[in-house]
Amino acid sequence: MKNMKSVYDGCSNTFTYDRPAFVKEPETTTTTAKPTTTTTATKPTTTKYTVTGTLPNARVKASKSNYDLRIKLPSGVTSYYLEDKYTSRQLFMSCAGNYVSHFNNASNRYAKSSMSGFTVKYNSTKKRTYVYVKASSSYRGYAVSFDNGYAYIKWGTPKTMYKNILVLDAGHGGSDSGATGNRLREKDLTLSIVLAAKKQFDKDKNYAVYYTRTTDTYPSLTARSQLANDVGADYFLSCHINSASATAKGSETLYNSQGYKATNGVTSYKWAANVHNFTKAATGFTNRGLVNRTGLAVLRHTRTASTLTEFGFITNKTEAASMKANTDKYGKAMFNSVVKMFQTNPSKR
């Protein structure tokens, strides 16, 4: 055999072999695999905001890529109230708690566009912080979005920002009582009707509604028309109560045949006819129809489709009592007339 030597031993008659050296097998190393750890990326938490108030829906949206003013919000505050305080040309924002120092800190806001004012107040009674943003001395519409700790605010002319614009006028007011009869004053009835309509509009943000008055004040006739012209209203609606003899009765609606059209081409006559259908249905009074009145200031100077509706006669005892009891019903009828008009005749914006 290869690598073996044979030796004969004469005494023992024994063969002895030189055995080859033992070859050690290579060691096998066993490695225990560590369990694989899977790392899942944590998605950033998205803050949810609760927004209430009467600010209308805007056709132009505010976002972190489209804004005029960016405001850093206080940490942990996620509920806000928004309102267009157009009489003072301001956007109003409020939240619970005292954050005056936070909002007054200039480093917490950044303006891409110039603005007329930024004011912060604390209401100790309601325990809320009030923020007033004044974009301009002229009327402005606003859009606001809340995203990841910031409020983004966009503004522009009302007709740029809002799709459906109405001016609602409560006739008379202040020192001008209007017609009187049966212990009632026209200015009180018209205001009650308009405020009832406002309750409906406040719940539907598809409409930007400007009111000539919401308290017992007297805006001039010029101011009423000018409001509609300044905001670029689609429609103007003035609420009134008639007066004559004790036997006069019925509902009628006035229009100006020489007046302006709405932005979508609707005439004052068509607008008046729409409103009158709701007025007469709500009152149930005698239908006196549509009346052409070219001399009325608010119908002559308003540069859009405009109408003035007379619900009934304050001098008629039966109608006066009915009107006093049904202002909420009439207000809802005015709301429904506006909704119907915009649905059947959308604005061109």
Question: Where are the predicted features?
Answer:
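Short linear recognition/processing motifs and adjacent strand/loop elements at protein termini
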Residues: 1-166
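Active-site histidine-acidic residue metal-binding/catalytic motifs
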Residues: 150-227, 231, 257
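Solvent-exposed loop/turn segments at secondary-structure junctions
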Residues: 172-175, 214-219, 241-247, 258-262, ...
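A short, glycine/acidic-enriched catalytic loop
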Residues: 176-184, 244-274
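Extracytoplasmic/secreted envelope proteins and their assembly/folding machinery
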Residues: 191-194, 198, 222-225, 251, ...
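Sec-exported extracytoplasmic/periplasmic mature domains
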Residues: 195-206, 229-233, 276-284, 328, ...
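Active-site-adjacent mobile loop/cap segments within catalytic or ligand-binding domains
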Residues: 238-241, 254, 289-349
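Active-site-adjacent substrate-binding region
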Residues: 266-292
